[in-house]
Amino acid sequence: MPSNQTNLLQGTLDLLILKALALEEMHGLGISRRIEQVTRGTFVVKPGSLFPALHRMEEASWLVSSWGESENNRRAKFYRLTAAGRRRLETETDQWRRISVAIAAALEAT
């Protein structure tokens, strides 16, 4: 693994997927690309991690999917947030902010 890439911390994948879908529906490759883009290449989500997570999140009713056509005219499954998914995004965002503050405090402790 290149040195500029980091393994996803446990629990962050859901947050990143939900955030990627917050503005618009996307297919799997679009979600992966968006996460890589917004994290400036720090997180690269491989299909073996992404698609099981999408399936699990759809089972939890955080996402719904429908078949459509991708930008290169291929059939693709598009995912979008549900109301429950938006609530989950808020919850996960709040939790991550609390964790970030706590870790920053720990790193600055002498």
Model-derived regions, located:
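Intrinsically disordered, low-complexity and often Lys/Arg-enriched segments
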Residues: 1-2
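Glycine-centered, phosphate/nucleic-acid-interacting loop/turn motifs that mediate DNA/RNA or nucleotide
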Residues: 61
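Short beta-strand "wing" residues that participate in macromolecule-binding interfaces
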Residues: 65
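Basic, amphipathic "hinge/linker" alpha-helix immediately C-terminal to the N-terminal HTH DNA-binding motif
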Residues: 72-93
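Amphipathic alpha-helical dimerization/coiled-coil segments
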Residues: 87-110
